[in-house]
């Protein structure tokens, strides 16, 4: 669905339906005077008498077909004092889905309404971004492998237009809507990659996706293979890919617009295990098919770069994606094996299903040596322990830099990504002691998410601003909503985009 703009006031507006957002106990006919001018039948539409504007309620009001706006799709927001950006996103998604069900080709939203529905701490521009993003996410479907199409399946609307009162579209409104469009595109990219089957979405496939983004947007892309990684000394990463038939890749993608080449980059490292059997420490069969989503960290970074390509922000950003399968094989790493990491530290691998931290530790060392980053953020579906602690809607945030941690948590909350701070207690590092090596890759069952984060902490140089995001819970969902039909969620794409666009606060 395209995002468009119509200026010139109600006399110039044309749409098959207009979505309006209504608070409980506020009359529908008073939502916007310009809309009432364009659709005067709205004040007497019978369906309007029954509409109570409860949260998630959607009503369709039909007018005479001769009018330029023959339908109004009213979406309830509930009580004004309870309104949040998340509720606005959900309302936009619910409204556009109803428009799709009605087979409406062109949909409008009155721009002047956006400021009046903004929660106290936000403005019309933020609401415009959320409405556009929510509407686009509401139309997301993953059905590319269905060969038999449903004849009743409605097509998406062709466009959503913001309807403006003045002669021109304000530049800031245009920018806000385009930002919402860009981040929704990025989340769609991440969702597609997580939802894709592991026989298609291989490390080589992720590399080809990165290269396609590079060609389209001018990003610099490098791809390193198995032999190069081994010769570089990435023994921990190699211990994971040793048993896999699909060849591993380390993907580097860089956004460096003119004038930013000398900046210290913001570096994101994303776990890219395209299928995780657990290796020799084999997982149970139940739900193993969901382990195709164990590359959600890498997918989020590719989604970020897809969004950056649409907005071209003046900031240097690097993505590092260590990608492999974790498979059992005659060559696979055995529990008890000892490997030497890129940092020179040795690790005793007690459990081959704790593989994410092994490829991440080498990637983190590589990133620090090569770029001396302004800040270093890794994200990974790392531990089931984090899901046990926080559930499926909240990610774990491990960071001993208060300013960086606050930036991630606050910006994430604004855009619908929830993070909760968890500790990096130094005493827990005792859990990672090995009798035969510098470190063990696992500790006791208790505090599993903290132990994993502390393992990564051993590979962060002094003075480096670092955060670890354990996104195992919210990266994939079985729960359907107006914003997501289930499966990959695109979690963290928007948070990363906000960190790039707003910058990292000083420590």
Curated annotation (Swiss-Prot):
- Extract the Pfam families matched here: Peptidase_M17, Peptidase_M17_N
Write the record's keywords in alphabetical order, separated by commas.
Answer: Aminopeptidase, Cytoplasm, Hydrolase, Manganese, Metal-binding, Protease
Q: Which InterPro entries match?
A: Leucine_aapep/pepB, Macro_dom-like, Peptidase_M17_C, Peptidase_M17_leu_NH2_pept, Peptidase_M17_N
How is the co-factor bound, per the entry? Binds 2 manganese ions per subunit.
Select a single GO molecular function from the record's annotations and give it.
metalloaminopeptidase activity
Instruction: Write down the chemical reaction(s) this protein catalyses.
Output: Release of an N-terminal amino acid, Xaa-|-Yaa-, in which Xaa is preferably Leu, but may be other amino acids including Pro although not Arg or Lys, and Yaa may be Pro. Amino acid amides and methyl esters are also readily hydrolyzed, but rates on arylamides are exceedingly low; Release of an N-terminal amino acid, preferentially leucine, but not glutamic or aspartic acids
Coiled-coil positions are none
| GO terms under cellular component | cytoplasm
Asked if the record carries the keyword Iron-sulfur, the reply is no
An example of a Gene Ontology BP annotation on this entry? proteolysis
Cellular localisation: Cytoplasm
Q: Which cofactor does it need?
A: Mn(2+)
What is the stated purpose of this protein? Presumably involved in the processing and regular turnover of intracellular proteins. Catalyzes the removal of unsubstituted N-terminal amino acids from various peptides.
Q: Quote the NCBIfam families the UniProt record gives.
A: PRK00913.1-2 (NF002073), PRK00913.1-4 (NF002074), PRK00913.2-4 (NF002077)
Q: What is this protein called?
A: Probable cytosol aminopeptidase
The organism is Nitratidesulfovibrio vulgaris (strain ATCC 29579 / DSM 644 / CCUG 34227 / NCIMB 8303 / VKM B-1760 / Hildenborough) (Desulfovibrio vulgaris)
Whichever gene encodes this chain, its name is: pepA
């Amino acid at each position: 669905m395209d995002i468009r703009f119509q200026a010139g006031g109600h006399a110039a507006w044309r749409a098959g339906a207009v979505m309006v957002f209504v608070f409980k106990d506020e009359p529908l006919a008073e939502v916007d005077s310009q809309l009432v001018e364009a659709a005067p039948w709205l004040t007497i539409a019978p369906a309007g008498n029954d509409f109570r504007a409860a949260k998630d309620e959607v009503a369709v009001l039909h007018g005479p077909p001769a009018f330029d706006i023959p339908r109004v799709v009213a979406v309830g927001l509930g009580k004004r004092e309870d309104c949040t950006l998340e509720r606005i996103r959900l309302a936009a998604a619910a409204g556009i889905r109803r428009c799709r069900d009605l087979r409406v080709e062109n949909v409008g939203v009155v721009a002047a309404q956006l400021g009046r529905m903004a929660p106290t701490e936000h403005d019309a521009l933020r609401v415009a971004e959320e409405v556009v993003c929510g509407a686009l996410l509401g139309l997301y479907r993953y059905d590319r492998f269905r060969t038999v199409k449903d004849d009743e399946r409605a097509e998406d609307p062709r466009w959503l237009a913001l309807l403006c009162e003045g002669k021109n579209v304000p530049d800031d409104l245009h920018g806000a809507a385009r930002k919402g469009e860009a981040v929704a595109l990025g989340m769609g990219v991440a969702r597609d990659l997580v939802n894709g089957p592991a026989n298609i979405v291989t490390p080589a496939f992720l590399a080809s996706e990165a290269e396609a983004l590079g060609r389209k947007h001018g990003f610099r892309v490098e791809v390193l293979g198995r032999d190069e990684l081994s010769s570089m000394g990435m023994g921990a990463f190699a211990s994971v890919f040793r048993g896999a038939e699909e060849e591993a890749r380390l993907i580097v993608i860089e956004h460096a617009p003119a004038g930013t080449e000398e900046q210290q980059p913001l570096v994101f490292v994303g776990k890219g295990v395209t299928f995780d059997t657990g290796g020799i420490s084999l997982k149970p069969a139940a739900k193993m098919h969901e382990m195709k989503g164990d590359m959600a960290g890498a997918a989020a970074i590719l989604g970020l770069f897809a969004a950056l390509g649409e907005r071209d922000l003046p900031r240097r950003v690097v993505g590092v994606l260590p990608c492999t399968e974790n498979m059992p094989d005659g060559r696979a790493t055995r529990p008890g094996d000892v490997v030497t990491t890129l940092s020179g530290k040795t690790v005793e691998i007690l459990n081959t299903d704790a593989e994410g931290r092994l490829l991440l530790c080498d990637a983190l060392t590589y990133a620090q040596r090569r770029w001396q980053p302004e800040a270093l953020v890794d994200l990974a579906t790392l531990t089931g322990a984090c899901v046990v602690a926080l559930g499926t809607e909240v990610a774990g945030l491990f960071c001993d830099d208060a300013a960086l941690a606050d930036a991630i948590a606050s910006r994430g909350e604004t855009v619908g990504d929830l993070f909760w701070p968890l500790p990096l207690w130094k005493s827990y590092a005792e859990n990672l002691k090995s009798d035969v090596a510098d470190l063990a890759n696992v500790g006791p069952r208790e505090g599993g998410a903290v132990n994993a984060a502390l393992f990564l902490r051993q590979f962060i140089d002094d003075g480096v601003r670092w955060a670890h995001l354990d996104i195992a819970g919210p990266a994939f969902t079985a729960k359907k909503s107006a914003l997501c039909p289930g499966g990959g969620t695109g979690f963290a794409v928007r948070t990363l985009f906000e960190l790039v666009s707003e910058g990292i606060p000083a420590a």
